[in-house]
Amino acid sequence: MWNPEENDSIEDAAASARSLNELLDLMYLSFEKMSPPQTERLLGFALNISSDISVWMDKEEKRREKQHY
């Protein structure tokens, strides 16, 4: 799994964003068929992915701010 602390590549961040989108789309299409524990695990996974993307965005914003000063 991608770690934003170790890999600052935009390609990896974009791949994580696509994975999150696909996971949420699949969950939306299958929501009524999933058991509550399965839903809970997948939501946890989605939250982890979104957190990774958020960390990367924060670091990228700080990096870009340093370039302008």
Predicted regions and their residues:
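Sequence/structural signature of long amphipathic alpha-helices
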Residues: 1-69
